[in-house]
From Swiss-Prot:
Motif Q motif, chain ranges: 64-92
Top-rank lineage group of the source organism: Eukaryota
Protein name, as recorded: ATP-dependent rRNA helicase RRP3
Lineage: Eukaryota, Fungi, Dikarya, Ascomycota, Saccharomycotina
Region annotation (Disordered) ranges: 1-63, 450-480
Species in which this protein is naturally found: Yarrowia lipolytica (strain CLIB 122 / E 150)
Keyword Transit peptide: no
Segments of skewed composition (Basic residues): 462-471
Amino acid sequence: MAKATEKRVKRAKKEESGSESEDNDAIAQEILDTTKSDNEEEEPKKSSKNYTSVEVDESEEQTKTFKDLGVIDSICETCEELKFTKPTPIQAQSIPYALEGRDIIGLAQTGSGKTAAFAIPVLQSLYENPQPLYCVVLAPTRELAYQISETFEALGSAMGLRTAVVVGGMNMMTQAVALSKKPHVIVATPGRLVDHLENTKGFSLRTLKFLVMDEADRLLDMEFGPSLDKILKVIPRQRNTYLFSATMTSKVEKLQRASLVDPVRVAVSTKYQTADNLLQYMVFCPFKHKDTHLVYLVSENAGNSMIIFARTKSDTQRISLLLRNLGYGAIPLHGDLSQTARLGALNKFKSGSRNILIATDVASRGLDIPAVDLVINYDIPSDSKSYIHRVGRTARAGRAGKSVALVSQYDLELYLRIEGALGKKLDSYPLESEAVMLFSERVAEASRAAIQEMKGEDGTKKRSKFDKKRRRDEMDIGEQ
């Protein structure tokens, strides 16, 4: 701790002596370098930066309590109320170092409890030294930002915690009013936070004590590098920084060197594992009958909560319309929807008023969607990690779950790559071709209607018996 504090003091003195601009130029170069190449190696080069490294196995049983980690009684009591019975591996290893004042690099997958791993130390520090604009958490997506805010609010409920979510797609003026109320914690996407730093009168982060970058690998993959650079330039150099990421790529390594001081690196090993209570299946089907097989699977699992993953926004919308035309409660989730519609879709799915979510990979990481019974991969993802993240939406918190991959003749190479990474072959889903093809005529009609609607053709008289139902469901999408 003394070493980290000494380095922070040196940084603060540089700011006072006017040499901050040189450091900021160095930061700018470091961060902007992270976005130069799309073909960088997945694993980082050896860094000259020294840090303490802790490796922990995800399957390792935890015997410590939150109190054993040094967490204060009031937060421990809140953890009990939230049913956080024992710390997860990432929490058990990172929280004690964070409470000592160390910067943290946390390498862990979604569902590992990493949000609480950085929220608890921030809240404990805030409890001991309450002041506004204490912490900023940066997230790559709007949905994840709201999820993080909910976790902070739950853990900080006994403290009267004030939070503000600042993301794109929402009203700037409303957000400016929320910022003027001096929240303790701001959860933001980088681009919108920069908008407020540059345009919202009276708003600054000069008193900031904590910066958290969650899912840093995605922040950089989504080319937030220039925005991160601007943020790092205007916040105090004497602060605590937590960087959490699913992978330690070379881009993340550069970001770590530019923004952290003497960090502790806590890595939770997963080895491309899926949950033991997850049943994984595949269905080989000709591409032209893919929709028919999908509808058969949905029919066989009617009443269950399911997420169907598609590769493109267009397919997400089309499949949603197709299923709704057939009477299923399906809602889409993709980047072309307004923020209100996206939150409305998530709320309806979480509450159970709609039980089928058709999503692009925006929903495969970071979102806490409980009690999903089935994941269907309509399109095979292009890499094994995405597959792990997708099927990880089910079989959570000890529950059983099931996943099915639809594999056409065009997906074989990708599918075999995933089997190789998993180290096992997936079982074939039990079905009878005759039973599947009984759906083909109805599916073809519903599909034509969906495509016609997406093209915006009028054809009111020619179009189908599905029109009234479509209009009703369209209104449902945007509801909160």
